């Protein structure tokens, strides 16, 4: 008998045992064509109180069997296949969890500017042997905000009738949206676009001078506090029609302040149904 199969000195259930930070390159056969992703994977199974340890090599074998030998059509399909393979190889496990961190590219347009922009993504799936399935999708993006308070104060002080013509300070904002659902995974593209539309303006990798001017002018017509950004993002995510109402939503923003030595943070947690209820009452 393997040492792992012996009874443990302290018979306690372990929710997760496995590897963190397994790096693999995966090829997805998407409807838009082949996509190569560099993945950082966490692969776990649970462990019954009657067993001392997990046969950990099976975790890597499960990853290799899927990444090397199969072609998934999506990142969610890839992770689901790995989780199923984990349950198949670990007959004693009741639950498998797989998390992937990677960088995605989203087609973006704002103020007449177009670009294919990077977003950071973390996708987690948990499968149970009884058929339970849980997804968590987190997307992190960057954008800019224009301070409405400074803009309003300067407009009033300088007698500027149109506040959007008044100067203000602007800052880069780091925005992260996370949705936790049952058997429906939120599409990365949908979540990313909801977030990217929640700033005074998004950021772009390449801007020529006329594009830069248009983007800044548009941002100044939409001044936002970091609190506004978080609420706007939650509103837009809740408007994605296929997300079930029971889904858990979390939005976090960090504003890298330009005129202060410290940063600002805002965060919201809610069920999607609660946000939708407020949205319907405000129409």
From Swiss-Prot:
Site annotation May be catalytically important: residues: 147
UniProt gene name: mptA
Pathway: Cofactor biosynthesis; 5,6,7,8-tetrahydromethanopterin biosynthesis
UniProt catalytic activity: GTP + H2O = 7,8-dihydroneopterin 2',3'-cyclic phosphate + formate + diphosphate + H(+)
NCBIfam families in UniProt: GTP cyclohydrolase MptA
Protein name per Swiss-Prot or TrEMBL: GTP cyclohydrolase MptA
A GO molecular-function descriptor: iron ion binding
Species: Aeropyrum pernix (strain ATCC 700893 / DSM 11879 / JCM 9820 / NBRC 100138 / K1)
Presence of keyword Metal-binding: yes
Family the UniProt entry places it in: Belongs to the GTP cyclohydrolase IV family.
Subunit text: Homodimer.
A Pfam family of this chain: GCHY-1
Function: Converts GTP to 7,8-dihydro-D-neopterin 2',3'-cyclic phosphate, the first intermediate in the biosynthesis of coenzyme methanopterin.
One example of a Gene Ontology biological process annotation: tetrahydromethanopterin biosynthetic process
Record keywords: Hydrolase, Iron, Metal-binding
Keyword Metal-binding: yes
Cofactor note: Binds 1 Fe(2+) ion per subunit.
EC number: 3.5.4.39
Cofactor(s) required, per the database record: Fe(2+)
């Amino acid at each position: 008998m393997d040492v792992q199969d012996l009874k443990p000195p302290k018979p306690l259930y372990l929710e997760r045992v496995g590897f963190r930070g397994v790096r693999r390159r995966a090829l997805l056969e998407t409807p838009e064509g082949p996509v190569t992703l560099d993945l950082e994977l966490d692969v776990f199974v649970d462990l019954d109180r009657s067993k001392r340890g997990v046969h950990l090599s099976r975790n890597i074998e499960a990853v290799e069997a899927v990444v090397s030998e199969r072609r998934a059509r999506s990142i969610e399909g890839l992770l689901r296949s790995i989780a199923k393979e984990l349950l198949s190889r670990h007959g004693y496990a009741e639950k498998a969890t797989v998390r992937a961190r990677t960088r995605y590219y989203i087609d973006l347009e704002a103020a007449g500017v177009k670009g294919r922009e990077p977003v950071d993504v973390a996708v987690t799936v948990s499968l149970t042997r009884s058929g339970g399935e849980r997804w968590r999708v987190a997307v992190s993006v960057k954008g800019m905000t224009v301070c409405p308070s400074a803009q309003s104060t300067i407009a009033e002080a300088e007698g500027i009738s149109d506040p959007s013509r008044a100067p203000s300070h602007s800052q880069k904002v780091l925005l992260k949206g996370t949705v936790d659902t049952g058997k429906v995974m939120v599409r990365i593209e949908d979540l990313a676009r909801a977030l990217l539309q929640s700033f005074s303006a998004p950021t772009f990798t390449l801007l020529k001078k006329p594009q830069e001017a248009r983007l800044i002018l548009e941002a100044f017509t939409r001044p936002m506090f970091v609190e506004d950004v978080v609420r706007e993002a939650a509103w837009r995510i809740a408007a994605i029609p296929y997300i079930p109402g029971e889904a858990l939503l979390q939005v976090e923003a960090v504003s890298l302040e330009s005129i202060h030595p410290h940063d600002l943070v805002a965060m919201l947690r809610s069920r999607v149904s609660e946000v939708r209820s407020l949205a319907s009452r405000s129409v």
